[in-house]
């Protein structure tokens, strides 16, 4: 199994609530919000009105990004109806930005629908993109080996010593 496949296997074992927490942690590692100032949160388990979490768009908390996290089998497809429901949930919160993250894939109709929204920006992240982001931001993975390659710094020798 590849690293991404192994990560997906672990993601699929998580409870939905733990998966939502992982998504918020990933977004924090990517530079959104900060847990220290309680700017990022997973919403309560029930009655979340279609919103699984909220992160601030920047360190100052000027804008919020609403999260929908769906841990579905990786061979399933998220369709347009799910994106429409998320859009409705965003509207209910008065929100303009949302991220729909899933372990599954998005249908062409879902992607096209999200892309044509004018008043609300919805970013779709599928299972492949999710595992790539986890690897890139070192969430749920550890570095086994690091190689340092050095070369001569010619600028150092050209400056006045």
Please identify what each model-predicted range represents.
Residues 1-161:
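Mixed-charge (Asp/Glu-Lys/Arg
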């Amino acid at each position: 199994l590849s690293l991404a496949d192994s990560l997906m296997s672990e993601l699929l074992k998580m409870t939905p609530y733990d998966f939502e927490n992982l998504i918020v942690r990933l977004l924090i590692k990517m530079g959104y919000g900060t847990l220290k100032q309680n700017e990022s949160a997973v919403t309560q388990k029930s009655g979340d009105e279609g919103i699984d979490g909220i992160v601030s768009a920047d360190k100052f908390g000027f804008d919020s990004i609403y999260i929908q996290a769906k841990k579905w089998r990786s061979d399933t497809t998220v369709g347009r109806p799910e994106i429409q429901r998320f859009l409705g949930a965003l509207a209910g919160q008065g929100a303009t930005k949302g991220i729909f993250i899933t372990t599954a894939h998005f249908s062409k109709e879902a992607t096209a629908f999200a892309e044509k929204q004018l008043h609300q920006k919805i970013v779709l992240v599928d299972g492949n993109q999710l595992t790539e982001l986890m690897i890139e931001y070192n969430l749920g993975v550890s570095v086994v080996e690091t190689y340092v390659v050095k070369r001569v710094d010619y600028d150092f020798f050209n400056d006045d010593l």
